[in-house]
Amino acid sequence: DKLQKFQNRAARIIAGLSYETNSADVLESLGWETLESRRQRMKSVFLYKIINDYTAPNLKQSLMGSNSMPSSYILRSTDTDIAFPKPRTEFLKKSFKYSGAKLWNSLSREAKEAQSISIFKQNIGR
């Protein structure tokens, strides 16, 4: 949150606008994303790479684990979601396995079934 405020202030200075100007408008005029949207986009790309075997196999095994369907089922069936357990703690909600699966499941089917990273990036925006 502090870092986002810093980015907003820097954007206003670069754009030569006053502090009263809406930060979302300033970021949009500069073509900047919020830090949160950038994090989500980068996490989505990383998940795509994990699921489609562009990373070390242990990452996919760790993400899919025993709480999930086999990857062959996920990628070849009509259901492209990652199964994940209901979190019992805040710690689990903040884990990459949980938040990543939740993010992946929120993506469009078109994005999840993209044939390349560049197509995936186009499908998730930006």
Spans of features found by a protein language model:
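Hydrophobic/basic alpha-helical segments
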Residues: 1-126
